[in-house]
Each structure stands twice: as structure tokens, then as C-alpha cells.
UniProtKB/Swiss-Prot annotation:
Any one Gene Ontology BP term: DNA replication
Ranges that cross the membrane: none
Name of one Pfam family that matches: DNA_ligase_aden
Biological role stated in the UniProt entry: DNA ligase that catalyzes the formation of phosphodiester linkages between 5'-phosphoryl and 3'-hydroxyl groups in double-stranded DNA using NAD as a coenzyme and as the energy source for the reaction. It is essential for DNA replication and repair of damaged DNA.
Family: Belongs to the NAD-dependent DNA ligase family. LigA subfamily.
UniProt name for this protein: DNA ligase
Residues at the catalytic site: K117 (n6-amp-lysine intermediate)
Annotated residues for binding of NAD(+): D37, A38, E39, Y40, D41, S86, L87, E115, R138, E172, K288, K312
Catalysed reaction, written as an equation: NAD(+) + (deoxyribonucleotide)n-3'-hydroxyl + 5'-phospho-(deoxyribonucleotide)m = (deoxyribonucleotide)n+m + AMP + beta-nicotinamide D-nucleotide
Enzyme Commission number, as recorded: 6.5.1.2
Residues covered by the BRCT domain: 590-672
Keywords, ordered alphabetically: DNA damage, DNA repair, DNA replication, Ligase, Magnesium, Manganese, Metal-binding, NAD, Zinc
Principal EC category: ligase
Length: 672
């Protein structure tokens, strides 16, 4: 029997939870904050303090569970009770009218529900007796991954519903633009690779094994479908969305019921114009038959329902003025021109810079200083200049000529054989050294946390670092003298630098920035030669005998290790205790694997993994991945929104695998 004091504590905890969830709903779902951030933080602090003191009163639906628990070892596989199908796409008015005609021929009069197509990650959410018990990714549509702990960190997702109902809901997890911009700014400061777009950032966040990482990313979610709606007595999609509102889910308020296809087209036109004003990315409109009875009558193919279609917006193009062209020197010496623009909003973000690729591109497009230009942003971090608008010229515009000398060190620029880029070949070029340092400490290379671009710029400016080896001579006093570098940060950074000495050889190889040697080739070389010394002594012929090492890469490796300054650098790194041996397991390829010796091409978007993950799996199983389809291609792996590569594969009679077949072959090859 509980004593009075315990009863009071339990009551206090329950009241705190109720208050916090009420404020959560007001802030994250209704977008109407009811208290200040400081007041909210104080309520949360009190709750967590009480739950820490009285763990017997901690429950799975407590708001405290949203901060993220202990890291997971791996994601458990989840089989969807009802497959998560993808949608067929429409790209123009004709496609939509064809869809409407097919639907009406089958079911007669119909009304549609139009919804914004949120550019995020589809997830399945299962509740039992009103409590959130499991969340999973779409995966291949049949099997996904259990990401329950990461989904719990999304503040707008209810952990307990307003009714004790058992329900399965589908939703779209996404990253708002402000959260995306903050995240990329932080990653840039830390010298980490930037996310290309909010969708990739959301997907990457939900696939973190540490829920605290997901909690820090400020994700959001819209619920859009009730899987077992008819069991609950719901007869239409619009009614199901209203029911989700009643339960406490966040649904998209922009949805609209349309009686005709013309109403649908008006809705699409309206949101095509307004999409930039939204605080999140959308890439189209989803159109669904409203009545469940008609949905059932229309049925589905193996891949997609016949009662729904997704209209995809074309990539957004806008016009602005090019005010200048800025030149930057990369770590390999390539001089890249970037357009400096009058600020303009594209796809919801303010753009001031756009890629101009190279000198040939500027000349072919006749792009001049002062021109009005068309820019396009289709998922890339930096948009590109599509073309200039000569008809808007006033006569004041000036043709742009690439310089003959490096903007960073004044050395003469050269254009190597078969290259369009101009290159600075001075190994002492400060811009190349600085960019090389940023590459060396990056996540895929030596992974030195805390050494972002701004810190490296300061180290460079204070002449503390002129080579990657200098990083291993830094002292605490030198670091503390830097701007915004306290004692604790300096200590952490020195520990990270020290820890990097134990990295396996492939990380060091990639970090050195040998021309043509990417992360995968570095792993191959490290695995084959096992020590830096053996690799340094390798001949061109020995290198070319290795699968995936071609003549160009072999020449580059031999040239690199023959340089006196490289030999001196490696000697310094050895002296400082940097590991130069391969620590991984020797890879053996089973020649009976379906992948062994075959050439693959990837096209479209895979739901279960990224393009780079798919490439790595193929290569691990003995296959090779190329970027274009030819007669030498053995298999084309097709994801959603596959393009011209799929058509070419069909024309050439090349074997085509969908994602389900691809995953099946991977599994079978692992079991061989």
C-alpha cells in the first residue's frame, strides 16, 4: 500500500506530464506556444528530477522519454502487416486526366482528397490501447527497420492517444527548413559533410543508432493514413484524417476534398505557387480516391495502389542577377567559379550562390557579369546556373575570363590532358593546404571531432599548422589562445587528435587526399597491402593487378609516393605515433555470389538504403558499380523515379532488378 508521500509524488508526476503534453501539443501541433521556453524547460526539469528519484513511476509515454535513451547496437527488422506501397507518378495535366478517366470508368462518380506531398521519410506507427509501441521505416515496402526510440524524440508525435484505441498509422517524418539550415551550419563548423536536402537529413537522423542524435535534430511528422480504418468504422480517407486529429496526431491542414479533376488541377496550381512559403519542403501533391469502398474496388498492383497518384512538381527555376563570379581553390588545386547572385528565394531557401562548374560551361552558356540568369535547385546544396538571358542585357554586362594565375598563390594555372578544369599545381598553395587539412580531419578520413573549418582557418592564420603532421604537435596553450576555444574544448580536441592516431590505414590513406583515391579505393589498397610501407613500394603493375585500380589511379599513387615531401610527411606521422597498418579483416569474395564479377548500375531512389550504401553492398559481394548503362552492364537496380537508365537497359535487354529482388539477392549471397 502506498503511503501519503508516495501518493503525492505520483500525483505530482502525473500533473507535470499532463501539463507538458498540453504545452507540447499547443507548440508542436497547433503552432500556438502557450508558455515561454524557460517555463517549459523548468517543467521538464522538475519531471525528470522526480522520475530520477522515483523510477517506479517512470512510464513509456512520459515526455521525458523524448530526450533519447541509450544507443542501440543495431536496428531490428520489422515486417509490415500491410505492405507500404509506393505511388505511381504523374508529371503533367495529361497524366492526371488519364488517371481520372481510368478511375471513373471503374467506379463511376468519385471525389478525391488532395494533400501536400511532404518530402520526408515514410514511417509506420503502431499503437496498442492508445500507447505508442512501435515505429518502423518503409524499407522495401514489406520489411522495414524498428526506429521506435528515434521516433519517440519527435515532439509532435503522441506517445499516448486521446482514446484507448489499437491502431496502425502511416506518417511522413520530415525536417523543417529552419532545423535543416541550423544542422548544416553546425556540420559545416565541425568540418562534416553537409546534407544535400532536408529529406536526406531526416532519413539520416532517424537511422542513427543513438536516439540522442535524433532528438537533437528537431524533426517533425505529419500523420496521413489509418491502416485499419475500416475496422474502426471509418468509411473514407477524409474521415480518417479527421479522426487522426481527434486522437492528437498532427495532420496537414492544407488537405482539400475535390469533386472534379479540374478542382484537383486548381489545387495543384495553387500550391505550386505557394510551396516556397511553407516551412518545410514538398515535392508534389498526392491525390487519393476518398471512399474506401471505391479504393477496394480499384485495388492495387504489386507496387502501387490504383486509387492514388502523386503529381510531382518540376524543379523550380527562378531569375536573378549575377553580380560577381568568385573563384575558389580546392584541395586538389582545381579552380572553381561560383556565381554570386542577388539574393532570391528558391524552393523555400534564400540563395546567393550558384555553381558555374568550369570555364567551358561559362563560355558555352555565354554567361557574363551583370547578366540576368536562370537558376535551378533540384535537391543540391548549391543550385546551378541554367542559362543567361541575353534579351535582358543593357550593354553594361562584361564577359568573364578565367585567370591565368592562381587566386590564392599566384602560380600559373594549367589544364591537364582530358580535363575541363584549370588547376594550380603548386604543392605549397595555401588554399590547397587549408582544404587538404579540412579533408584530412573529416568524418570519412581521420574523423577528428571539433576540428571544423573555422578552427582550421584560425590554426592556419596563426601559422600553427602548415601540414597535416602539424596537427599532432598542437599544445593546449596554443589551442586556448584561439577564438571561442575554452580549456574544456581544447582538452577534448587534443583527445580527439590523439585518438585519431589509432585509426586503421584506410582512413589515413583517404585523408592524405591522393588524387583519384576515394574512400572505397583507400579501403581496397589498405586491405591488399596491409601496411603503408608495402604500399609505398608498390609498382604500377602491382597496383593495376588489383580489382578496381585502373591505370590512371595507379599512376597517381606511384607519383604521389615518389615525392620527397610525401616521404618526409609520412616519416613525421610515423614519429608522432600515427598507425600505418590495416586493422580490418581480410575480405574474401565468394565466387558463387550472384554479384561476383558483375557490373551493376543503380538508378532511381531506393527506400531501404542510400545509393552509397547500395554501392558498398554490391562491392562487398564482389560486384562493380558504374554510372552509366552500356552493353557491358550486367544488372540495373531500379528504385523509385527511375529515369533514362531504365529505358536504355530495356532497349539493350539488360537484366533489371527492382528493390525487392535486389534485397533478396543480397540476403541469398550472404547465406552462400
Amino acid at each position: 500500500m502506498k503511503n501519503v508521500a508516495q501518493h503525492d509524488v505520483e500525483k505530482q508526476i502525473a500533473e507535470l506530464r499532463e501539463q507538458i503534453e498540453k504545452h507540447n501539443y499547443a507548440y508542436y501541433v497547433l503552432d500556438q506556444p502557450s508558455i515561454s521556453d524557460a517555463e517549459y524547460d523548468e517543467l521538464m526539469r522538475k519531471l525528470m528530477e522526480l522520475e530520477e528519484q522515483y523510477p517506479q513511476y517512470k512510464t513509456p509515454d512520459s515526455p521525458s522519454q523524448r530526450v533519447g535513451g541509450a544507443p542501440l547496437e543495431a536496428f531490428r527488422k520489422v515486417t509490415h502487416r500491410v505492405p507500404m506501397l509506393s505511388l505511381s507518378n504523374a508529371f503533367n495535366e495529361g497524366d492526371l486526366r488519364d488517371f481520372d478517366r481510368r478511375v471513373r470508368q471503374e467506379v463511376g462518380d468519385v471525389r478525391y482528397v488532395c494533400e501536400l506531398k511532404i518530402d520526408g521519410l515514410a514511417v509506420s506507427l503502431r499503437y496498442e490501447d492508445g500507447y505508442f509501441v512501435q515505429g518502423a521505416t518503409r524499407g522495401d515496402g514489406t520489411t522495414g527497420e524498428d526506429i521506435t526510440e528515434n521516433l519517440k524524440t519527435i515532439r509532435s508525435l503522441p506517445l499516448r492517444l486521446r482514446q484507448q484505441v489499437t491502431i496502425e498509422v502511416r506518417g511522413e517524418a520530415y525536417m523543417p527548413r529552419k532545423s535543416f539550415e541550423k544542422l548544416n551550419e553546425k556540420r559545416k563548423m565541425n568540418g562534416e559533410e553537409l546534407f544535400a536536402n532536408p529529406r536526406n537529413a531526416a532519413a539520416g537522423s532517424l537511422r542513427q543508432l543513438d536516439p540522442k542524435v535524433a532528438a537533437s535534430r528537431q524533426l517533425d511528422i505529419f500523420a496521413y493514413h489509418v491502416v485499419n480504418a475500416e475496422e474502426l468504422g471509418i468509411l473514407s480517407h477524409s474521415a480518417a484524417l479527421n479522426y487522426l486529429d481527434e486522437l492528437g496526431f498532427k495532420t496537414n491542414p492544407a488537405r482539400q476534398v475535390c469533386e472534379t479533376i479540374d478542382d484537383v488541377l486548381s489545387y495543384i496550381e495553387q500550391w505550386h505557387e505557394r510551396r516556397a512559403s511553407l516551412p518545410y519542403d514538398i515535392d508534389g501533391i498526392v491525390i487519393k480516391v476518398d471512399a474506401f469502398a471505391q479504393q477496394k474496388q480499384l485495388g492495387a498492383t504489386a507496387k502501387s495502389p490504383r486509387w492514388a497518384i502523386a503529381y510531382k512538381f518540376p524543379a523550380e527555376e527562378v531569375v536573378t542577377q549575377l553580380v560577381d563570379i568568385e573563384l575558389s581553390v580546392g584541395r586538389t588545386g582545381v579552380v572553381t567559379p561560383t556565381a554570386i547572385l542577388q539574393p532570391v528565394r528558391v524552393a523555400g531557401t534564400i540563395v546567393q550562390r550558384a555553381s558555374l562548374h568550369n570555364e567551358d560551361y561559362i563560355r558555352e552558356k555565354d554567361i557574363r557579369l551583370g547578366d540576368y540568369v536562370v537558376i535551378k535547385k533540384a535537391g543540391d546544396i548549391i543550385p546551378e546556373v541554367v542559362c543567361s538571358l541575353p534579351e535582358r542585357r543593357t550593354g553594361k554586362e562584361e564577359p568573364f575570363d578565367m585567370p591565368t594565375h592562381c587566386p590564392a598563390c599566384a602560380s600559373e594555372l594549367v589544364r591537364l590532358d582530358d580535363e575541363v578544369a584549370l588547376r594550380c599545381v603548386n604543392p605549397q598553395c595555401p588554399a590547397q593546404i587549408r582544404e587538404g587539412l579540412i579533408h584530412f580531419v573529416s568524418r570519412q578520413a581521420m574523423n577528428i571531432d571539433g576540428l571544423g573549418e573555422k578552427v582550421i582557418a584560425q590554426l592556419f592564420e596563426h601559422r600553427l599548422v602548415r601540414s597535416v603532421a602539424d596537427l599532432y604537435t598542437l599544445t593546449k596553450d596554443e589551442l586556448v589562445a584561439l577564438e571561442r576555444m575554452g580549456e574544456k574544448s581544447a582538452t577534448n580536441l587534443l583527445q580527439a587528435i590523439e585518438a585519431s592516431k589509432q585509426n586503421s590505414l584506410e582512413r589515413l590513406l583517404f585523408g592524405l587526399g591522393i588524387r583519384h583515391v576515394g574512400a572505397k579505393a583507400a579501403k581496397t589498397l589498405a586491405e591488399h597491402f596491409e601496411t603503408m610501407e608495402r604500399l609505398q613500394q608498390a609498382t604500377k603493375e602491382e597496383l593495376m593487378a588489383i580489382h578496381e585500380i585502373g591505370e590512371k589511379m595507379a599512376d597517381s599513387i606511384v607519383t604521389y609516393f615518389s615525392k620527397e615531401e610525401v616521404k618526409q610527411l609520412l616519416e613525421r606521422l610515423r614519429a608522432y605515433g600515427v598507425n600505418m597498418t590495416y586493422k580490418g579483416a581480410k575480405q574474401t569474395i565468394d565466387i558463387s555470389s550472384t554479384f561476383a564479377g558483375k557490373t551493376f548500375v543503380l538508378t532511381g531512389t531506393l527506400q531501404s538504403m542510400s545509393r552509397s550504401e547500395a554501392k558498398e553492398k554490391i562491392e562487398t559481394l564482389g560486384g562493380k558499380v558504374t554510372g552509366s548503362v552500356s552493353k557491358k552492364t550486367d544488372v540495373v537496380v531500379v528504385g523509385e523515379d527511375a529515369g533514362s537508365k531504365l529505358e536504355k537497359a530495356k532497349q539493350l535487354g539488360i537484366t533489371i532488378w527492382d528493390e525487392a529482388r535486389f534485397l533478396q539477392e543480397i540476403q541469398q549471397s550472404k547465406q552462400v
